């Protein structure tokens, strides 16, 4: 019998990381944790190390590494604790690693995800910002290295399942008319427009269907999450923005659809549980038990659809514009959004200010070509600086 596949889980203490480790634990004959990384939830990371006994753990700073190393050694765990961004890249690209779950949220996850790609790993991509920021560079690296890139976002995983195996030959060539990217509409889908300025972080984080981290929950509430996913879909499936249509589907049962030229629409359905796309990507092209309950269509009862209202969700409009503009625009969109969402979560700005800040950054910063990672990161820094200036002027 072959040895278990070794997986590095980047962002192990987040919701995606925990779901990944749940699947790992269900299949000890198939998978084992090689490295687990965490950022701020270090007590949770220690507990995960005690349970999964990885070869490596990675934390942000040396002091935290020394403390965690001591705790694990006292418990008889031989995990070696590393620290810093370079260590993240090392555990993502180590020769012993078979697959990498890239689940660090935001721009911080880009270098390690790219390191896994350049090392030719099977990369389970949950960090959508990596593709949003550096789409062309990222996909070129995939082709150059021979990495296997499998999407973890439920929507992109659904699209991947609904496309033919040879979709890389070109969407038109395989008969695809358009990709239908579904969205729940978040907690504010029916909130009166005049009330959106006064919603709280707690309300924004109360997603009706999915359990997610705070930043992604706010992105879902503003539908920036769907805007980032639109950009990601364009890169993953070599689609034009005009070929990707966003559809609000409140039940979150249909995770996305592919519309073909013969009139067929193929969809992937399932309960809203990230273990489904995670297990599919881990085992692809096979399928394995994930722990997700079967979908009860009789309990679902009905499936509703509606067009997104761009007045209610201006972030979706801004993301589509950035996708159409290209160059550094998506990286700046993402950076401005990260700054704005953090400020909202800290109660420095209103929910409605998030889109205002992003639009201000996109209007003030010139779009440039991005031909290297340094240029991507420079665009990211410029956008963060401009967004910070807005906060100083209006929220200081």
From Swiss-Prot:
Mn(2+) binds at residues 153, 155, 229. Pathway: Isoprenoid biosynthesis; isopentenyl diphosphate biosynthesis via DXP pathway; isopentenyl diphosphate from 1-deoxy-D-xylulose 5-phosphate: step 1/6. SUPFAM superfamilies: 1-deoxy-D-xylulose-5-phosphate reductoisomerase, C-terminal domain, Glyceraldehyde-3-phosphate dehydrogenase-like, C-terminal domain, NAD(P)-binding Rossmann-fold domains. InterPro entries: DXP_reductoisomerase, DXP_reductoisomerase_C, DXP_reductoisomerase_N, DXPR_C, DXPR_C_sf, NAD(P)-bd_dom_sf. The keyword Manganese applies. GO terms for biological process: isopentenyl diphosphate biosynthetic process, methylerythritol 4-phosphate pathway involved in terpenoid biosynthetic process. Its cofactor is Mg(2+); Mn(2+). It holds the Pfam family DXP_redisom_C. GO terms for molecular function: 1-deoxy-D-xylulose-5-phosphate reductoisomerase activity; manganese ion binding; NADPH binding. 1-deoxy-D-xylulose 5-phosphate binds at residues 128, 154-155, 184, 207, 220, 225-226, 229. It is an enzyme of class 1 (oxidoreductase). It catalyses: 2-C-methyl-D-erythritol 4-phosphate + NADP(+) = 1-deoxy-D-xylulose 5-phosphate + NADPH + H(+). Keywords: Isoprene biosynthesis, Manganese, Metal-binding, NADP, Oxidoreductase. NADPH binds at residues 13-16, 127, 129, 213. Its EC number is 1.1.1.267. The keyword Zinc-finger does not apply. Catalyzes the NADPH-dependent rearrangement and reduction of 1-deoxy-D-xylulose-5-phosphate (DXP) to 2-C-methyl-D-erythritol 4-phosphate (MEP). Belongs to the DXR family. This is 1-deoxy-D-xylulose 5-phosphate reductoisomerase.
